[in-house]
C-alpha cells in the first residue's frame, strides 16, 4: 500500500518551516495505524444467493454471497470535490463544487430538461445557467445538489457503480450531527452503497502527516479552522472557526484590482481566482515589501480575451486579510491570533506537544510564502515557546490523502457502517462507528 513519507516510521520527518533542527517523525501510536494495509476491502453484493455464515443479526444472515471491491474516498469542500480509490497517493478526480442551474424563465411546466449541470457539463451546454454552490462556509445547505454532484462523480468521472463500493466521506469540524445522518441517508438510500464511514476532515489531514496528535490549521475555500487533536480525538470545545478563507481572498483581490484601474465584475470571479493562484503571494514582512521598487513587483497577466493587465502590490496586499481580517470588514481574529488562542486553551503538557506539531492544510495555504509568514507571526507571539509549522507539498489534498490512508488500513475495516446495519438499527448506528 502506498503511504506518504510522513506516514511510515523511519522515512523521515515532514518539512519544517523555520531554522530549527527537524525532529524525528512521531511514531504512529494507534493500533489502527500500525496494522498496515487492509488484506481485503469491503464486501459488496454479488449475484449469487449462496448463504453466508450466521451472524448476530437476522439481516446479516440473509445477505447473499459477496465479492471484494476498492473503497472510494470523497472529500466535499466549498470550492472543490475530490474523489478517488482508497490506497492511492492523491485524488484522481477533482471538480468544482459550483454547479449550474437553468434560470426559471427558461423552464417550462412538465419538461424533462436537466436541472443541474456539473463539471464539464457546464462547458458543454448552450442553456443559460445560474451558478450556485450547495455549501456555505463548509456546511451543506442543498443536499439535492450534492446528490447531483456525487451522481456525476460516480457515473461520469469515476465510471463506477456506487452500489459496488464502500464510501468514506469527510466532514468538517463543528458540523451539525444531522450532516452525518443525511450522508448516510443519501449513500444508503439513493446510491445503495454497501458500506460507508464519515471522518472529520481535520483528523484525516493529520493522518496525511503521519501523526496522531497535532494542531491542524486548515484554510480552505469557504472556511478556516484551527483544530487541536490529541491521540486521534479532536477537541471541539477549543476548536476555532473563522468564516473567511480563499473565496474571501479572491473577492478582496477583485476589489484591489478594480481600485488599480481594472474593471472586473462578479461574473469574472473565475479569472480573479486564476490570478490569485498564479500571481499572488504572502509577504514575510508587508511593511518592508512595500519599500521594494514597484518595478520589481510588476508582472503582466494575459486575460482570456488576449488583453494584458499589470499587477503590482496587490499581489501581496490581498493575502494580508488572513492576518488582519478588518481589511475585509470581519470582526474575527486573525489566523495567527486564533492559532495562539487555541494553544493557550490547552493544558501545559498538551500545549507543548501541539506547539511542535502545527500542521498546515487547505488550498489557500499553497500561496507562496504562507507557511513562513505564519511561522514568523507565531514565533513573535510565543517568544518563550517553540512553535513549529509543518508543511506537506500537496497539503491542498491533505484531507483526501488522509482518508485514502485510513480506508486502506486493516485495523480500520471493522469501522465501516454496513447498509444492513443502517436498515436494521437506523441512522443513529453511525455514532457507534464514526466518532
Curated annotation (Swiss-Prot):
The organism's place on the tree of life at top rank: Eukaryota
Listed Low complexity bias regions: 20-31
Region (Required for interaction with TES): 31-51
Native species: Homo sapiens (Human)
Quaternary structure note: Interacts (via N-terminus) with TES (via LIM domain 2). Heterodimer with TES; the heterodimer interacts with ENAH to form a heterotrimer. Interacts with ACTL9. Interacts with CYLC1; the interaction may be relevant for proper acrosome attachment to the nuclear envelope.
Impact noted for substituting residue 41 to Y: Abolishes interaction with TES
Gene expressing this chain: ACTL7A
A GO molecular-function descriptor: structural constituent of cytoskeleton
Keywords linked to the UniProt accession: Cytoplasm, Cytoplasmic vesicle, Cytoskeleton, Differentiation, Disease variant, Fertilization, Golgi apparatus, Nucleus, Spermatogenesis
Family per record: Belongs to the actin family.
Protein name: Actin-like protein 7A
Location of this chain's protein in the cell: Cytoplasm, Cytoskeleton; Golgi apparatus; Cytoplasm; Nucleus
UniProt-reported outcome of changing residue 246 to A: In SPGF86; uncertain significance
Expression tissues: Strongly expressed in testis. Also expressed in other tissues.
Xref: InterPro entries: Actin, ACTL7A_N, ATPase_NBD
Gene Ontology annotations for the cellular component aspect, listed alphabetically: acrosomal vesicle; cytoplasm; cytoskeleton; Golgi apparatus; male germ cell nucleus; motile cilium; nucleus; protein-containing complex
Disease link: Spermatogenic failure 86: An autosomal recessive male infertility disorder characterized by acrosomal defects of the spermatozoa, resulting in oocyte activation deficiency and fertilization failure.
Skewed-composition ranges (Basic and acidic residues): 55-64
A biological-process GO annotation: single fertilization
Start and end residues of each stretch annotated as Disordered: 1-64
Protein role: Essential for normal spermatogenesis and male fertility. Required for normal sperm head morphology, acroplaxome formation, acrosome attachment, and acrosome granule stability. May anchor and stabilize acrosomal adherence to the acroplaxome at least in part by facilitating the presence of F-actin in the subacrosomal space. May play an important role in formation and fusion of Golgi-derived vesicles during acrosome biogenesis.
